[in-house]
Amino acid sequence: MPPYRSRTTTHGRNMAGARGLWRATGMKDGDFGKPIIAVANSFTQFVPGHVHLKDLGQLVAREIEAAGGVAKEFNTIAVDDGIAMGHDGMLYSLPSREIIADSVEYMVNAHCADAIVCISNCDKITPGMLMASLRLNIPVVFVSGGPMEAGKVLLGGKTKALDLVDAMVAAADDKVSEADVAAIERSACPTCGSCSGMFTANSMNCLTEALGLALPGNGSMLATHGDRKRLFVEAGHLIVDLARRYYEQDDSSVLPRSIASFAAFENAMTLDISMGGSTNTVLHLLAAAHEGEIDFTMADIDRLSRRVPVLCKVAPAVADVHVEDVHRAGGVMAILGELERAGLIHGDLPVVHAPSLKEALERWDLRRTSSESVTEFFRAAPGGVPTQVAFSQNARWKETDVDRAGGVIRDVEHAFSKDGGLAVLYGNLAEDGAIVKTAGVDASILVFSGPARVFESQDAAVEAILANQIKPGDVLVIRYEGPRGGPGMQEMLYPTSYLKSKGLGKACALITDGRFSGGTSGLSIGHVSPEAAEGGLIGLVEEGDSIQIDIPNRRLHLDISDEALAHRRTAMAEKGKGAWKPAHRTRKVSTALRAYAAMATSAARGAVRDVDQLFH
């Protein structure tokens, strides 16, 4: 039976000093010997998805102590990708994931905590905490802050649902008046919570449910709704139970690596493909699998993408459906229920709240359950009142959406598409793969070819788009924005939003070794690997080169002869120290970012750090 980790610091004469310090934090004689549970919070006033978390750590802590544990809360950082977007602040977003993972590991291991409750929400925080949890492999429960309510605005006599991306697109569209832009800006993000579409934050919070590490509703219950409080209360009790099962009953089935197994990663990726989640989830699942020593790769994602249909389309793939609508239709459990019926996921896997996923679905899938309380839970609706306060409203839909033929969530027979919402492309431009969110690509441009318009930075591409220098049929290539080349692998939400605003969203393609926001749609191909800074072919593309994209056949190809390619490689090598570096780009790169770049790996490996690279 494994000993409680915390007894390293709470037991024995030689730990008198440590016990003295524990007493100074409020511990009493009777607390020594109880499981010490770390509450990893991520409150910050910088991020709407985290602005309401300040008191929620202590809410969980009280429940932990009521269940017989000792709770100790700490905070980690959180970057708002939307605020960091469109300038050099975005260089820090992806590297912050590693810092979050490290900070959780540091705090938990330094103080020998026995288990963790991870209070996350936005883009890099959930992945960072997930990476840490799989590194540490001690009992964990995830509970996120929840999604924001969708915005509503009255334009031209009609009420329109909207989100952050609408504000970006409208601001760049010369045809939209100043008054309408102001109205959209003021209405796009009305409440606390993670942005209301199926962007990266909400995608990842849904995937923690599929991995088995979070409670039902974690990915879809609104941040503002009173019912979300129950998740925090239950998490506090559940984590003490999981800790006791492991340390007192020698039940290793409750550990993260037992729950988030290879098969669970298949379930999570299957969910992601079926709901057209953010392409960033590919990076984050690969990174989490790496930390858990699970051999889950791009090849597995490619395999799954070829057999999983699209059962749910949410903004940005469609304009008028947001995560609050997914919740009304039964949330993640309803999508998993349809996938399980079709034999597309593993139902026999353990989850933190039930012996198996299949047993959980019997209670939580709206089409199976007889529980009135579950139905009531999924009737939780937006309150329609701007607020930064958690659990501040209790609105209800009159009924849930269980229409699986024409509703927000479909069954396999009525799928939006038989092909999945994400695809892995290969070819000479992406020998190790590239990712495209097919759920956001118009059917008319699934096969596309055109001349390359080459840019050495996101900023240069934005400047060209806004100056009307991009024409229908162009293929924008934005390079040296990968994990090492950026460094930090910036998101390209502004270029794709500006293409939309110029009426080019269905007339152009964008290819990059950087990545895309979960808010991106259109023919946007990211994570091109190997990246330009690693000697990838994307670094040799020249203005006017013909590029072919064939999503149905998973192909990304630069039309170039072997002779011409060899000549370009020779010319690049002759640049010496200037080889595989962006020409004419002025960008100040801090020591912190240089350290990340020195260890960063390819997007095909999740852009995780590899310390061994420092010694080659």
From Swiss-Prot:
Origin: domain of life: Bacteria
Enzyme class label: lyase
Cofactor(s), names only, from the UniProt record: [2Fe-2S] cluster; Mg(2+)
Gene: ilvD
Function: Functions in the biosynthesis of branched-chain amino acids. Catalyzes the dehydration of (2R,3R)-2,3-dihydroxy-3-methylpentanoate (2,3-dihydroxy-3-methylvalerate) into 2-oxo-3-methylpentanoate (2-oxo-3-methylvalerate) and of (2R)-2,3-dihydroxy-3-methylbutanoate (2,3-dihydroxyisovalerate) into 2-oxo-3-methylbutanoate (2-oxoisovalerate), the penultimate precursor to L-isoleucine and L-valine, respectively.
Organism: Methylocella silvestris (strain DSM 15510 / CIP 108128 / LMG 27833 / NCIMB 13906 / BL2)
Binding site residues for [2Fe-2S] cluster: 122, 195
GO biological process: isoleucine biosynthetic process; L-valine biosynthetic process
Subunit structure: Homodimer.
Residues annotated to bind Mg(2+): 81, 123-124, 491
Protein name per UniProt: Dihydroxy-acid dehydratase
Gene3D superfamilies found in the cross-reference section: IlvD/EDD C-terminal domain-like
EC number: 4.2.1.9
Cofactor note: Binds 1 [2Fe-2S] cluster per subunit. This cluster acts as a Lewis acid cofactor.
Reaction catalysis annotation: (2R)-2,3-dihydroxy-3-methylbutanoate = 3-methyl-2-oxobutanoate + H2O; (2R,3R)-2,3-dihydroxy-3-methylpentanoate = (S)-3-methyl-2-oxopentanoate + H2O
Alphabetical keyword list: 2Fe-2S, Amino-acid biosynthesis, Branched-chain amino acid biosynthesis, Iron, Iron-sulfur, Lyase, Magnesium, Metal-binding
Family annotation (InterPro entries): Dihydro-acid_dehy_C, DihydroxyA_deHydtase, DiOHA_6PGluconate_deHydtase_CS, ILV_EDD_C, ILV_EDD_N, IlvD/EDD_N
Pathway assigned to this chain's UniProt record: Amino-acid biosynthesis; L-isoleucine biosynthesis; L-isoleucine from 2-oxobutanoate: step 3/4; Amino-acid biosynthesis; L-valine biosynthesis; L-valine from pyruvate: step 3/4
Active-site residue list: 517 (proton acceptor)
Pfam families per UniProt: ILV_EDD_C, ILVD_EDD_N
Entry GO MF terms: 2 iron, 2 sulfur cluster binding; dihydroxy-acid dehydratase activity; magnesium ion binding
PANTHER family: D-XYLONATE DEHYDRATASE, D-XYLONATE DEHYDRATASE YAGF-RELATED
GO CC annotation terms, alphabetical: cytosol
